[in-house]
């Protein structure tokens, strides 16, 4: 659809790479309703097609669409899914999931992982090179991912107030040791250590040239 078009970019999310429509059936309606989102989950072959899009550069960004609701809010509409609020969590899960399932399993390169999770979004939204790269003058926004550790997602490991994750019980072959924002450590070993009010307003510039974003 975007072939031959300029300034059209493609974004996906972890759920469309790792989960399938089987989640709607597994565990019955009370479990399946928690996976309501738009667009809906599809088949395994659709997952693989998106992985291929990441490899060849036709998919440029992996975001989260982080829009969780509590189990209570979901289950209130189990009798009619059309009234169910759509959305799941993803902010905390995105990076370890994609590094483990993408880089460590050989689906995408480390370079593509960095582009899709950081650099390309910064270029599209006019924040590069302040964001999305490590070079003189850039913000020192860094995560340290440790492939010698593992991490299991569960109700007691996440900080979202929705109370569950679509990846509950899934174990990654890596863990995030620390997160830095503008050179300051704001999270270490799954614990927030930053200061309230440390965020700043970012003023965007023009989007980086299309060819520089989509080049393989």
Task: Mark where each language-model region is.
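Short, solvent-exposed cationic patches
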Residues: 201-216
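His/Asp/Glu-enriched, well-ordered alpha-helical/loop segment
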Residues: 30-35, 61-62, 68-149
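Flexible loop/turn segments at secondary-structure boundaries
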Residues: 16-20, 69-72, 123, 151-152, ...
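A short acidic, glycine-rich active-site loop
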Residues: 34-45, 84-90, 165-171
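Histidine/acidic residue-rich metal-binding segments in metalloenzymes
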Residues: 1-62, 79
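C-terminal cap of metal-dependent C-N hydrolases
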Residues: 76-80, 136-202
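Short, positively charged
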Residues: 111-112, 153-160, 212-215
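Residue-level signal for inorganic ion chemistry
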Residues: 11, 65, 98, 183
